[in-house]
Amino acid sequence: EDQKAFGLGSHLLAIAISEEGYKNLVNLTSWGWLNGKYRGKPRINHEQLRKHKEGIIFTSCCYSSEIGRAFDKIGPEAAEEKLLQMVDMFGDNYLLEIMMLDFVKQPAYNKFIIKMHDKYHIPIILTQDCHFCHQEHSHNQRLMLMIQTGRTIQDIKDAQLAGDTKDFFELQDANLWLKSEDELNLMWETKYSHIIDYEIFKAAKRKTVEIAKLASGVKLDRSIKLPMFPDADEDLREKIMRGFKWRRLPTRSNYLDRIKREYKLICSKEFSSYFLIQKMMIDEARRVCPE
């Protein structure tokens, strides 16, 4: 609820694998924006995750997860304790993630994740942290981050010469574009074969595809949903006359003639529901922001 807590926020990957899961995911998103927003960013707490976890696969996510931050700031024992909390919360719907990044801390974290997989038999998926789509976008991504942090290219060069490269910018050289399976296979062969056993690598790929298929099988109703009115024309007429009486307009005949003419036109175009929906939105806006 304060600046300190905001800085302790962590990442969690949630994947809906059923219609119920999608609804729960929407509920979590809505709650985060309506009740958990702080400094313009939505947040979700453990209580809400427990309440809306059905039909969702959760994973250990990246180095910025609760487990990853515990591993980085405290150590493996604290990270393992966080992992067991997640397993207790999500059960069999909780998976581990390994990533093949050039990020300097990633190999040690992958080793820890594989150790937890061996110890607790939690399935692993293989993912790729993606900050941009194509390899050639790396330079543009770095420039965007410089603009956001108020740095210049010369600032970064000076920091690199001084040996003061920040992880924030180091990540931009960590192969963070969206990769094909062939690219992932090549990366394993050239950089990660001594860290990730081939059988674990293959099993993680299979599990990833399995989860992707489950998520792809969720059928979403994308039709437009609007409030239904049994008799929209009559409802609109009542609201018009109520407003007319409330305003106590002086030249009644002129206004009544105009009301009849415009009301008839609205009904003939079947726009009554539209006006009623607009009235609902205006009323709600006035309720939320009375000033």
Q: Which role does the model predict for each range below?
A:
Residues 1-2, 131, 227:
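Short, solvent-exposed loop/turn elements at beta->coil junctions and helix N-caps
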Residues 1-101, 105-121, 138-148, 154, ...:
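Extended substrate/RNA-proximal surfaces in nucleic-acid metabolism proteins
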Residues 6-14, 122-125, 130-137, 142-212:
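Phosphate/diphosphate-binding loops
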Residues 21, 61, 125-134, 285, ...:
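Conserved phosphate/anionic-ligand binding catalytic regions in large, soluble enzymes, centered on
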Residues 67, 115, 190-291:
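Non-catalytic structural connector segments
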Residues 98-100, 126-130, 270:
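Active-site proximal loops enriched in glycine and acidic residues that flank catalytic Cys/His/Asp
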